[in-house]
Each structure stands twice: as C-alpha cells, then as structure tokens.
Amino acid sequence: MTDASSTAVSPTAALSAAGVRIWLDDLSRERIASGGLQRLIAEKNVVGVTTNPTIFAAALAQGAAYDEQVRGLAATGVSVEDAIFEITTDDVADASDIFHDVYTATGGVDGRVSIEVEPGLAHDAAATIAEAKRLAAKVDRPNVLIKIPATVEGLEAITETIAAGISVNVTLIFSLERYRGVIDAYLTGLEKAKAAGIDLSGIQSVASFFVSRVDTEIDKRLTAIGTGEALALKSKAGIANARLAYKVYEEAFAGDRAKALVAAGANEQRPLWASTGVKDPSLPDTLYVTELVAPNTVNTMPEKTLDATFDHAQLAGDTVTGEYAGAQGVLDALAALGVDYDDVTATLEREGVDKFIVSWGELVETVRKALTDAQDSEAAQ
C-alpha cells in the first residue's frame, strides 16, 4: 500500500499547477549563502524573488553576512550610494544565478529576480530610465527584472526601459485605470523594441498589483462610516480590485495590438499579486493567495505567507475569472457609501512611494554606519 502522505500534492505545488507562480518577497545574503533559496525552490515551488528597499534595509541591519564586503568597500572610500549599489546588485546577481536553472527550465518565464530603482526617482522619468539601465548592466543576468513604480512618470520609464530590451517589474499599481496605462506602456515599449530589431522573446514583464494595502486603506474608511452596510464590506475591496485587474489583463491581451506583438515573439505581461501578507489577524492567513488563483499569474509572498500556504492553504481552483460581477458589485457598493476609489488609489500610490523613500533612507543610514564602523575599526588596528 502506498503511503498517502508521500504522494499528496502540497498546496504550493497545487497552486503552481493552477497557473500561479510563487515568488518569494524577500532576499538576504544569509539566505543566499545558507542554501535557503535552493531549499525553497526544491520544497515549496518558489520560482522567483522580489526585493525592495525595505527588504534590503532589514537584511543589512541583521547579522554579519555583509561585513566582509563592507570592510572592502570602506577601504576603497566609496560613497554610501555606491556601496548600496554594489551590495544590492551583488545579492541580486547571486540570487539570479541560483534561479538560473528555473529560468532555463521555464524558457525564461520564471527564475526571475527583481531589483528596484532608487525610490526617490519615482517622479523623474529620465533618471529612472538611466538607473534601470545601470542596474541591468551591473547585475548582467538574463533573468533580472528592474522594478519601476507605476507613477505617471514611471509609465514613460517603463516604455523606454522595455524598448531597450530590459525586462521590467512594474510595481505599486493600485488603480485599474493606472493598470491600463501600465499595459499600454509595456506594449508601446515592445513596439519600439521591435522597430529597433530587438528580439521580443527575451523581454519579460510583470505588473505588480498591490492587494492588502487596498483593504487596509478602505477598511479604515469603512470603520469611520461605521454602518452595518459599511462594516460588511471590510476586507473585500483588495480582492475585488485585483479580480477586476485580471479582467483588464484578459481584455488587453485578447486585443489585436497585443496579439500582433505576441505573434512577433513577445510575451504577455503577467499580473503579479503583491502585498499578499494578511495584515488583519482576524482574517485567514492565506486569504490573498486562495482568493486570487488564476492562470498565468504570479503571487509574491513574504515567507510567513509562503509557509502558511505550504502548510494549510485550501485551494478551490480558479477563484478569479468567474467573479467579475461580484467584484464590480463590491466597488459599486463602496462608491454608493461615498468611498472615493480614485482618492484611495492616489493615496496608496503616494504613500507607497513615500514608504520606500523612508526605507531607502534607513538603508542609507545602515550602510553609512557600517562603512564608518569598518573605517574606525581599521584605523584602530
């Protein structure tokens, strides 16, 4: 008799089979050096990594994994900004090497590692384009994705970065209208790349739609309204918004413009569900995983959410494509209560950029202190 436990498919394997690719929303040198990434690939179906300034600030503030490189950088007298550039691109290059087999096995679709442009450039298209090219050249791996925020200025940067043949992870998307602009920016970039004779098949992109932050902001407003009708809508907006984003994706890539590019070798820009860690302890800890299962998507998870998904996620097939009417009903009900969708998403975009700028500042101070300490230690010897 076969042991049922030995043949059971894990929830993460089932999620992958349903068309949802699992990426880890975390990276550190300790995780790279310890074999932790390889274990997640082998055991929990992880096929990519996303990073951001908050993640790097936390990684550098903990442990001694960066000490040797910091000492070397301190000895050369580099600026804090250049030290950050060296440290973060080294981590991303090493992680990209670890995921190279996944990249090869999936024909370049997965095995992707993301690194974000400096968030202070979010409203400067030209500087973002230059930084995206600099990051891509420094990491110099075919499976790197450059993260560019979906600000108005970011849309131009997305187009020009894609046009240069560089793969892009578009981050901080909250509104459906901005998402349409992101898709247009991607397609325009592909058209320019095609005109320049660039092989479109090597260009990948994901559009990172943030989920739990939408609930956090809207639930705050619903609590302030305080009626039974308002409270009944709590924790529903984020999923509804993401489901309608998938509808936008389906419609856009069923259109003649996208189909012509795909026929020329281009890849669809996949929706990526970001901010999928549950903030409200009263909610199921896999809510933003199980309720957003749809083909050709990515879910990037903090490790806590990944572990919960692997341990006990209850999957029920596609939970997106048959839910568009209900999702629209949620947004309509919010509007009827006076919750201003455009104000919510504009607030979230502004706060998202600001939070990453704060994290970047923390990263700068952490590296500045590490460089100073290393220089002082060397001088004392």
From Swiss-Prot:
Localization of this protein: Cytoplasm
CDD domains (alphabetical): Transaldolase_like
Active-site residues, as the UniProt record annotates them: K147 (schiff-base intermediate with substrate)
GO MF annotation terms: transaldolase activity
One GO term (biological process): pentose-phosphate shunt
InterPro entries on file: Aldolase_TIM (IPR013785), TAL/FSA (IPR001585), Transaldolase_2 (IPR004732), Transaldolase_AS (IPR018225)
Recorded superkingdom: Bacteria
E.C. no: 2.2.1.2
Pathway assigned to this chain's UniProt record: Carbohydrate degradation; pentose phosphate pathway; D-glyceraldehyde 3-phosphate and beta-D-fructose 6-phosphate from D-ribose 5-phosphate and D-xylulose 5-phosphate (non-oxidative stage): step 2/3
One GO cellular component term noted in the UniProt record for this chain: cytoplasm
Pfam families registered for this protein in UniProt: TAL_FSA (PF00923)
Keyword terms: Cytoplasm, Pentose shunt, Schiff base, Transferase
Predominant cellular place of this UniProt entry's protein: cytoplasm
PROSITE patterns xref list: TRANSALDOLASE_1
Catalytic activity: D-sedoheptulose 7-phosphate + D-glyceraldehyde 3-phosphate = D-erythrose 4-phosphate + beta-D-fructose 6-phosphate
Similarity field: Belongs to the transaldolase family. Type 2 subfamily.
Function text: Transaldolase is important for the balance of metabolites in the pentose-phosphate pathway.
Protein name as it appears in the record: Transaldolase
Taxonomic lineage of the native organism: Bacteria, Bacillati, Actinomycetota, Actinomycetes, Micrococcales
